Amino acid sequence: MNAPNSINLKSFVLNLADLFDGDIEIEKAARRELSKVSEANFSSKQCALPAQILSVMQQSDAHPICADIVEMPFDWRPPETSKSPLYAKHSIFKSHIELVGPDGLVESDSIRLGLYGMLPNSEYGVRTHPAEEIYIMLAGECFWKRGDAPYCCERPNGRSYHPSMMPHASKTEDQSFMSVYVWVGDLSTDAYEYSGLPQK
């Protein structure tokens, strides 16, 4: 990797810390870990974001950091959190990159942090995992279901917080979305469970 790319990625990752400006411990943990990043390098692979996700990232209400994200040569792929065939089927409309974590561009055993988006008119069903988690919306809109509560729409700067083992689901309607997320606690995916779409 050339030096400019390495510097740009490190600066970008450090800038992500400013997004986690809430008072809850998970956001404080994200800020602490991001502030420690001393080196970051791009993967040798690259896959572009879908046009429908890029479009919402260029809207006037998108978080300013989206302008940097679209310039990064990331390898955007559906996540592989579960080996379940149903999970794989319900992941083809997702775009994801783990930036910091056990599988990230920056290695960490304290957090998993990445960028995650979905195409419009898509639904990612109910899942649970030991890690505590928060998503911060960067562009577009996403409807989040937490526990037994109904779906709630979140837009840029909105948050969806999921304590350990809380069932949660997400879906889009007319718009795609882009977000940044962080896991803390048990970062293993061994106990991740995906149960499919919520019952109507």
Where are the regions a protein language model picked out?
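Short acidic-glycine-tyrosine-enriched beta hairpin
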Residues: 147-168
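A short, N-terminal "cap"/entry segment at the start of jelly-roll beta-barrel domains
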Residues: 6-109
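Residue-level marker of beta-strand positions
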Residues: 123, 134, 158-161
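Short beta-turn/strand-loop junction motif enriched in small, turn-promoting residues
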Residues: 102-104, 122-123, 166-168
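Short, conserved beta-strand element in jelly-roll/cupin
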Residues: 110, 115-121, 128-144, 183
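Short coil/turn segments at secondary-structure boundaries
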Residues: 129, 148-149, 194
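Double-stranded beta-helix
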Residues: 10-16, 173-200
